[in-house]
Amino acid sequence: MFLTRRLLGPFTSAIARKLEHYSQFQPSSLTIQQYLDFGQTGTMKSSFLFLKNELLVRLANIMQEISLLPPTLLKMPSRRLVSNWYCESFEDLLQFEHAQVEPDIMSKFNDQLQTILKRHSRVVETMAEGLIELRESEGVDIASERGIQYFLDRFYINRISIRMLQNQHLVVFGVVLPESPRHIGCIDPGCDVESVVHDAYENARFLCERYYLTAPGMKLEMHNSVNPGMPISIVAVPSHLYHIMFELFKNSMRATVENHGADEDLPPIKVMVVRGAEDLSIKISDRGGGVSRTILDRLFTYMYSTAPPPPRDGTQPPLAGYGYGLPLSRLYARYFHGDMYLVSMEGYGTDAMIFLKAIPVEASEVLPIYSTSSRRQLTMSPQAADWSHQLPNHGNRNL
């Protein structure tokens, strides 16, 4: 109960007990096929009955982990604001815990989901500002940084999963319109991969040209080994794939322009898309000069960025800044059991590799579970060195 009090503060003991209760349950990992099937054959009633419990479980699991963060981070104003949002949302959902399945109740539930989505819209930026506040005020020791990295991977993939549940329900059973008539909620049963790649490239190019007045071109090669000669499509959440590609294109463009100079003929970014029997594989290759192995190990950490922090007044969307682009993109890839990693040759360029499950029944949610193991990871003291020098951790490959 002490951990709960650290998080909830002034909230009632009854709500604290509910938090303890729901954190004892494991979240239900769904496959993208289950999302798709339910979107086609499910009912608003059954979705309501599932969500009103599952959202409480997913919130409670991650809220317990928030309470285990280092005390120096817990007291940062931006971090406290995020916790308040989560506590408010947990309390809002509790009102439906024993609610009757009636049209007006389900309508109010939909309204509440939209309120929660809006409330949490700036969670990523606000948590990032909390880390900046911590760095500027007290600094971060190695042990705390490892715990924060472990937590944030779990926190953000939990956030992705909660928003997926909410958006899927609101598009299928609410008033939110799908992006395309073909979509089942947020899912496209025949996601045109080439189209998503082009959209991400064009938008990243627009941003690059806005900052540098130039941008590298793209050479795209598609290879469908399952249906040779046919366009590549999979069951996917297009917005997730777009997010990954857009962030990687931004990084490649920035590196290419800064390495070669805006006045030179820029080498193109090469993209290879391959549809295999089990995986959709995408490789993005640039000649942006690459990075050393020392830096490569840091690129997926939330406490590191190769660019200065963005302005806090929100006046201009930065091409780079918080340093969250790569770690969040990797989480979007891993959310449905895919992966993403980088291979870099210092002095030449970088390859980004993306793997997504092409078989929807195998594309299952990867969700954090609050447990003894997670508590130990978040609170353990630094270990005594057992090597004379630190070995490369290849952190861009391990979750």
Curated annotation (Swiss-Prot):
Question: Which UniProt keyword terms apply here?
Answer: ATP-binding, Kinase, Mitochondrion, Nucleotide-binding, Transferase, Transit peptide
**Reactions accelerated catalytically:** L-seryl-[pyruvate dehydrogenase E1 alpha subunit] + ATP = O-phospho-L-seryl-[pyruvate dehydrogenase E1 alpha subunit] + ADP + H(+)
**What positions does the domain Histidine kinase occupy?**
123-360
At the top level of its lineage, which domain of life is listed? Answer: Eukaryota
Binding residues annotated for ATP, in chain numbering: 247-254, 286, 305-306, 321-326
SMART domains in UniProt: HATPase_c
Q: What is its EC number?
A: 2.7.11.2
- Molecular functions (GO terms): ATP binding; pyruvate dehydrogenase (acetyl-transferring) kinase activity
One GO CC annotation: mitochondrial matrix
Name the Gene3D superfamilies for this protein. Answer: Alpha-ketoacid/pyruvate dehydrogenase kinase, N-terminal domain (1.20.140.20), Histidine kinase-like ATPase, C-terminal domain (3.30.565.10)
InterPro entries per the UniProt record, alphabetical: AK/P_DHK_N_sf, BCDHK/PDK_N, BCKD/PDK, HATPase_C_sf, His_kinase_dom
Write one Pfam family the protein is assigned to: HATPase_c
Q: Which cysteines are joined by disulfide bonds?
A: none
Transit peptide positions? 1-18
Compartment(s) of residence:
Mitochondrion matrix
Q: Name one GO biological process term.
A: regulation of glucose metabolic process
Describe its function. Inhibits the mitochondrial pyruvate dehydrogenase complex by phosphorylation of the E1 alpha subunit, thus contributing to the regulation of glucose metabolism.
In the record, the note on similarity to other proteins reads: Belongs to the PDK/BCKDK protein kinase family.
Query: What protein am I looking at?
Result: [Pyruvate dehydrogenase (acetyl-transferring)] kinase, mitochondrial
What is the species listed in this Swiss-Prot or TrEMBL entry? Ascaris suum
